[in-house]
């Protein structure tokens, strides 16, 4: 059995529904606890007992591989009893409402619920109807807080800080919950955030979120410490936002030439899944400047930290 982490950080919130509402101290506390789990996860014995006797329900109304698997591994390594539910196996497929599902689940007294839903705000609605702690694993185009936290951890481990860095977030900003959560977190932590996309993929009024806006890669990547690529979220598009995948890659896909517009020591990130040859070239994705695989590793550590920090607030914790 691995030793307990030294950090005694407790998240001063019952749920983690988004980055919005978190303080710099909250974020730093979660990242510091995550750092300890990175090291613990690299040991042969990865099991902890901090969630022993707790029940964690992963309720995913959208298909997910990496996020659901990451939360499942995180819960099991902490000793929780983990149950996975998908929309295909839920009563909602038979017409049950989200509220009825929440009330039914609450009657089973789960301690932690990890929820992903296609509708923005659905996770917050569900959280109002349950007694346990809820983690937002992505709601529509609204937020994906644990992705932003794992991205922040990855950046901090490689650059030593977040404050003062220039982060270029490139691609389908319009439909991206990852972009929104990252913008919120990076602004809180004092980074300079720039979004890079064609006008059709920029939400109206994005400047009000405290970002710089660029509509071509040369301008957008100039001086960037981190280049964060986003995929085209065609499942959230009602019409044609780009002429074609080939033309999009020509102007906004990240290849070696465009990466050269950033700082020489710039690092590349992508939340996944990647569309190779659309928003990113394979040579860049698999190259020496890529942090994409490391992001996946950081995801488990961050989700362990989030689950533990919330569980420390639960009754009899």
From Swiss-Prot:
Pfam families recorded: OTCace, OTCace_N
Residues bound to carbamoyl phosphate: 66-67, 116, 144, 147, 272-273
EC number: 2.1.3.2
NCBIfam families noted in UniProt: asp_carb_tr (TIGR00670), PRK00856.1 (NF002032)
Assembly description: Heterododecamer (2C3:3R2) of six catalytic PyrB chains organized as two trimers (C3), and six regulatory PyrI chains organized as three dimers (R2).
Function: Catalyzes the condensation of carbamoyl phosphate and aspartate to form carbamoyl aspartate and inorganic phosphate, the committed step in the de novo pyrimidine nucleotide biosynthesis pathway.
Protein name in the entry: Aspartate carbamoyltransferase catalytic subunit
Organism: Rhodopseudomonas palustris (strain BisB18)
Source species taxonomy: Bacteria, Pseudomonadati, Pseudomonadota, Alphaproteobacteria, Hyphomicrobiales
Gene: pyrB
